[in-house]
Amino acid sequence: MKKLIIMLVSIFIVAGMSSPAQSSQVTAKKYSSCADMLKKYPNGVAKNIKARNKAVKSGLSAPKVSKKVYKKNNNRLDKNNNGIICGQKKAEPVAKAEPFAFAKNIDASLPADWVAEFNQVMSNLGQLMPISEKINEVSNVQSPMNIYAWNSAVSNPFPQIPGAQGASISGNGSSTWMVLEIPESELRDKDLHRFKVIAHEYFHVYQIAMSRDAEGTQWLWEGGAKVVEELYSQQFYGRSLFDEQLMPIHAAAVQTPKIFENYGSGKDMNYNGSAFLALALAKELQQQGMSEERAFTAILRDFQAESAQEPDWKKAFVNTFNMTVEQFYQSLRQYPTAESTQDWISHRVVDATPVVPSKTLTLNSIFS
């Protein structure tokens, strides 16, 4: 019996001795610095709920409530003596980039119906193909971009752009703007081009944004804009130059397409030749299995995006279309040339009928 009592006492003593060891496992840790503490408690520590709530009201992220941890570390780390250790300010929400905008400078020489349609076209285009935020990476383009528009019947009324004329995206190296000098004859004759040109120049801004203003090739740049111009006309006005097969198209478009890579060939009337090449590329992609919509998306959107990553346009071409530029040029041999039936055209021409897009093709389906 005595032996049993001794054993029980021994067990009690051992248990009592083990108790401090167990309690030490839950003892609050002493942190050497806030950096050390924040690894465990990323928002810091509050001594109680009241201190936590006060911290949140003051703009801090909600700290962990732990009286033990606070008591262990407050003498060194609670520098403000406010019941908070290593409090952290709430992260500022990431500011969302403002949509790219245009500043419209419309001269009074333009009639009210043109101004109304101009605003409608700009609204439609903004919904169909919004300007990518990538344009903020182009150093000489700022938002809002100025648009200067006037009737050619008057001299350029904007002294800030001396010498400006015609329709273009122009700049001085530090800033970029859009010029829309609308021919008086187009306004008088109700020529659709007075509206279509807006889509053409807008698309150039879209191209600049998607490609980060990468230098490319004229026929894809201007040809793409011409195609968008005519697709817009087809979709919103019910007719376009596709109905007339983009005539005239110089035979050089299929005989020596390389000359359309740069401006100044003298054989690209109204960019019809460049547009033909873009349409022929779309047809080639369809023959390889792409849908019509997907082929035009690849040309008008994807190639521009690839150009932002690969500045060599011929390499970007291969990456986007899975063929070389030379292979595409060889495919143009399938399109015959012929003498023009128009007396005022002295050169051979190409019939664009085989490459004209369908009437059901829309900008919505391409850019959605």
Predicted segment positions?
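Positively charged n-region of N-terminal signal peptides that target proteins for export
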Residues: M1-L4
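C-terminal segment of classical bacterial N-terminal signal peptides
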Residues: V14-S23
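Calcium-binding acidic motifs and repeat modules
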Residues: Q22-L77, G87-V94
